[in-house]
Amino acid sequence: MKKILFLTILALGIRTNTQAQTTWAEHVAPILYNSCTNCHISGGIAPFSLVGYSKAVANANGIADATQKRRMPPWPANSNYKRYAHERILSVEEIKTLQDWVAQGSKSGDISKAPADPKPNTGAVTVNPNLKLKMPNYSVNTSTDEYRCFVLPTGINVDQFITAIEVVPGNRQIVHHVLVFQDTSQIPVNKDKADPAPGYLAFGGTGSNTSQLIGIYVPGQEPYQFPTGFGARILKNSNIIIQVHYPAGIQNQLDSTKVLIKLNTGSLRPMIITPGINHNNSSLTNGPLYIPADQTKTFYSKTVLNFKLSVFAVGPHMHLVGKSIKAYNVNGKDTIPFVDIPNWDFHWQRTYILRTPTIVEK
């Protein structure tokens, strides 16, 4: 009996000693470069880079902790409720690889087997845009969050359709997010003229009721590419207005963000990009929107559509007060899920693009 026990322990020991080593070069770098270094790169909005072994090993414990708790990569949407295109979600196997790497001493491995270091994303993805619109250089000096609008003339003299839109931050370290509007009125133009600095301050929009949202940018988000045959209508004589959010504490930083747009003059099916659905007091079924001090309240909002549409993407938003949000469509006996965010975080807002457009009956 003692001999059998000894042989069993010896066999287990041999198996443990010959277990494959998880290394940065062959196993960890591909994960980080695919899922993290869009932001964690020199010149990116993240506070430190994860490009190269030395940067990764210096943050090894933080990587293991943040990914195991799914704080990183940031993806607030509940993947058990709805799946999307361009998801930033690590698989269970990838998380285990990162855990094993740290547990085994965060070894570099054969550096020659590592993927090439990613380059800072300073350029654009959109090829041959019809419009290249750039805001004037603006020096950011702010102790509080600054929301600043810039008017970008288009020169468009006939109605057309936008088929793709991309925001390229001029300074990725300071641009928190960008909202893109079109407006045919002179309100934004006059506000811009009244402010001696480039652009003008405006919180919650452009300050014009006629502005229409046509695009959103957050760090790491892909350019809008509408499905074939669809487009967002852009009106003749319109200006593009971008509202750029600069976080608090920025000093003497220059930005010159630009917008690239692809156009089509054909007959396309119109896309409607609107922040208005379930976004006001009139849609609340248990309003008004009032929360007494030291209380938590749940509000329900409902909009009845009188037309049929195809949903391409959803962009839930609650700014700083909301804690969780869920959106869905009830069609007869069917419930169509759109998005569920159990723990809302203003800093990780984004647009969620559906894998296929979803038809919603009126």
Annotate each predicted stretch with a short phrase.
Residues 15-17, 36, 173:
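A composition/secondary-structure signal for short, hydrophobic, low-basic-content segments
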Residues 1-23:
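Bacterial Sec-dependent N-terminal signal peptides
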Residues 13-14, 63, 188, 328:
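Single-residue recognition of alpha-helix boundary sites
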Residues 74-75, 79-84, 114-160, 166-310, ...:
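Beta-strand-centric surfaces of beta-sandwich/beta-rich domains
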Residues 21-150, 239-243:
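Aromatic- and Gly/Pro-enriched helix-to-coil junctions and flexible linker segments
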